[in-house]
Amino acid sequence: KGDTGWLIIDPLTGEETSRLAMELVKKHLGDHPVKAVILSHSHIDHFGGIFGVASREDIESGKIDVYAPEGFFDHSISENVMAGNAMSRRATYMYGNLLQKGTKGSYGSGLGTTSADATPGIIEPTYLISDREGETKTIDGIKVEFIYTPESEAPAEMMFYFPEFKAMCQSENISHTLHNLY
């Protein structure tokens, strides 16, 4: 939480699931407005839930800022819309979406329990991060050090560090699953 509201990182895959997550946050952590959203990279499971945490109107008016790596929108469209049908068919096999749930069918996708069945959304970011040497922004009172890492785990990707909290989000650049190899 920032000085006046929430800073959301990667709002899940779809609007319905991210909206339910925000309801839990408000119930247990306080009903504060969303001030900014950080989209770490161009894979739909990290940005598709944008409209569950922020409205298009609030983003377009500048009420809520959206930070993403340079190339985010174009790479998201090319991978998730233009290649979406092929990727969806691949996911059916890869995640076992058509298998019966349970120990004799599917009990997980490897990355999680299953892929989301929710409405994805996308919007052009209001701020693009493009400096490979790093750039620092203060978002609602929170200092964030961004590092642009294109063509890593995704075509458009970035990592970021919160020095006040000694916390780093490496997106999916540092991962033990090597999930893009299968």
Which residue stretches match the model-derived regions?
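Generic beta-sheet signal
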Residues: Y67-P69, Q170
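Conserved beta-strand hairpin/beta-sheet module of binuclear metal-dependent hydrolase folds
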Residues: K1-L29, E157-E172
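Residues that flank catalytic or metal-binding motifs in active/ligand-binding sites
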Residues: G62, I123-P125, E133, A156, ...
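Core dinuclear metal-dependent hydrolase active-site scaffold
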Residues: K1, L128-A167, I174
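Active-site metal-binding motif and surrounding structural segment of the metallo-beta-lactamase
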Residues: T4-G5, E15-D65, S130
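Active-site environment of divalent metal-dependent phosphoester hydrolases
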Residues: S42-G48, F73-H75, E153-P155, S175-L178
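Metallo-beta-lactamase
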Residues: D74-T149
